[in-house]
């Protein structure tokens, strides 16, 4: 390694952006093949290659930051800006789903029976599983904050306990959401109501799964003593992402489950 006189991390050539992009292509193509031709082969292949690429890329970043010391204050500042911009892009991503929902529900067309929910649709009761899911995510927001503060105070035991509680709540939320989908009386193909409901809540559910994976990675890293009280951006990014998922759910609950029913 040559001597450098700046604090920036000059990243080595990596194959993971290329394999990640190709796996994303397989994933989206596979999703269309599954929806239209009931053939999940390409989707499974896309999922596997995406998971492998993500794991390898994440592993390299952990090595660079933890063992090679590349994540200086300047690099961490850049990573923070990157995470903030990523979350802003996600806000606009979900904004599109809310736009589609309100566009369809505020002025229902004659094809929908001129009412919302459309004729023939039995919406889910917002005071049952959706309300429980809201409580779970709010509780997980409290526990992730507890975990973060414990880490900053150097309380390793409480940090691990709080993080495990957050992960358990995330898994519980996912299980309840899957049960809700299974028992729902309508599907994604039941007109604009089914489409907007399942796409919006489904993408949120996917974000919960990604966030839970992020937190599990942080738990493993904490068990391996990767984090210190003043050097833990990986965990901080996971906490930001989790809070974003919490806030999106509140808007989904109020809009689609409560007002939309």
From Swiss-Prot:
Pfam families linked to this entry: COX3
Keyword set, alphabetical order: Membrane, Mitochondrion, Mitochondrion inner membrane, Translocase, Transmembrane, Transmembrane helix
Compartments it resides in: Mitochondrion inner membrane
Topology in the lipid bilayer: Multi-pass membrane protein
Source superkingdom: Eukaryota
Mitochondrial intermembrane side of membrane: 35-40, 106-128, 184-190, 257-261
Membrane topology (Mitochondrial matrix): 1-15, 67-72, 153-155, 224-232
Biological processes annotated in GO: mitochondrial electron transport, cytochrome c to oxygen; respiratory chain complex IV assembly
Swiss-Prot/TrEMBL catalytic activity: 4 Fe(II)-[cytochrome c] + O2 + 8 H(+)(in) = 4 Fe(III)-[cytochrome c] + 2 H2O + 4 H(+)(out)
GO CC terms: mitochondrial inner membrane; respiratory chain complex IV
EC number: 7.1.1.9
GO molecular function: cytochrome-c oxidase activity
UniProt xrefs under InterPro entries: Cyt_c/ubiquinol_Oxase_su3, Cyt_c_oxase_su3_dom, Cyt_c_oxidase-like_su3, Cyt_c_oxidase_su3-like_sf, Cyt_c_oxidase_su3_a-hlx
Entry's transmembrane regions: 16-34, 41-66, 73-105, 129-152, 156-183, 191-223, 233-256
Similarity section: Belongs to the cytochrome c oxidase subunit 3 family.
Function: Component of the cytochrome c oxidase, the last enzyme in the mitochondrial electron transport chain which drives oxidative phosphorylation. The respiratory chain contains 3 multisubunit complexes succinate dehydrogenase (complex II, CII), ubiquinol-cytochrome c oxidoreductase (cytochrome b-c1 complex, complex III, CIII) and cytochrome c oxidase (complex IV, CIV), that cooperate to transfer electrons derived from NADH and succinate to molecular oxygen, creating an electrochemical gradient over the inner membrane that drives transmembrane transport and the ATP synthase.
PANTHER family reported for this sequence: CYTOCHROME C OXIDASE SUBUNIT 3, CYTOCHROME C OXIDASE SUBUNIT III
Subunit annotation: Component of the cytochrome c oxidase (complex IV, CIV), a multisubunit enzyme composed of 14 subunits. The complex is composed of a catalytic core of 3 subunits MT-CO1, MT-CO2 and MT-CO3, encoded in the mitochondrial DNA, and 11 supernumerary subunits COX4I, COX5A, COX5B, COX6A, COX6B, COX6C, COX7A, COX7B, COX7C, COX8 and NDUFA4, which are encoded in the nuclear genome.
Designated name of the protein: Cytochrome c oxidase subunit 3
Taxonomic source organism: Tachyglossus aculeatus aculeatus (Southeast Australian short-beaked echidna)
Gene that encodes it: MT-CO3
């Amino acid at each position: 390694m040559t001597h450098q006189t700046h604090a920036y991390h000059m990243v080595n050539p990596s194959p993971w952006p290329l394999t990640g992009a190709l796996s994303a292509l397989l994933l989206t193509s596979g999703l269309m093949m599954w929806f239209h031709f009931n053939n999940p082969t390409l989707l499974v292949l896309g999922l596997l290659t995406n998971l492998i690429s993500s794991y390898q890329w994440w592993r390299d970043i952990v090595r660079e930051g933890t063992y090679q010391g590349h994540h200086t204050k300047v690099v961490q500042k850049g990573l923070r800006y990157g995470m903030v911009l990523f979350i802003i892009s996600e806000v606009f991503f979900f904004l599109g789903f809310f736009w589609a929902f309100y566009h369809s529900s505020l002025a229902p067309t004659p094809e929908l029976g001129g009412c919302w929910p459309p004729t023939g649709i039995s919406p889910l009761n917002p005071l049952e599983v959706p309300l429980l899911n809201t409580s779970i995510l709010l509780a997980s927001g409290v526990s992730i904050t507890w975990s973060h503060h414990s880490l900053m105070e150097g309380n390793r035991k409480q940090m691990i306990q709080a993080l495990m509680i957050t992960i358990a709540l995330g898994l519980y939320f996912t299980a309840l959401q899957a049960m809700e989908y299974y028992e729902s009386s309508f599907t994604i193909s039941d007109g604009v109501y089914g489409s907007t409901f399942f796409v919006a809540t489904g993408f949120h559910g996917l974000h919960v799964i990604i966030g839970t994976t992020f937190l599990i990675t942080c738990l493993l890293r904490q068990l391996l003593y990767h984090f210190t009280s003043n050097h833990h951006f990986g965990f901080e990014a996971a906490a930001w992402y989790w809070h974003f998922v919490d806030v999106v759910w509140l808007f989904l609950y109020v809009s689609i489950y409560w007002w939309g029913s």
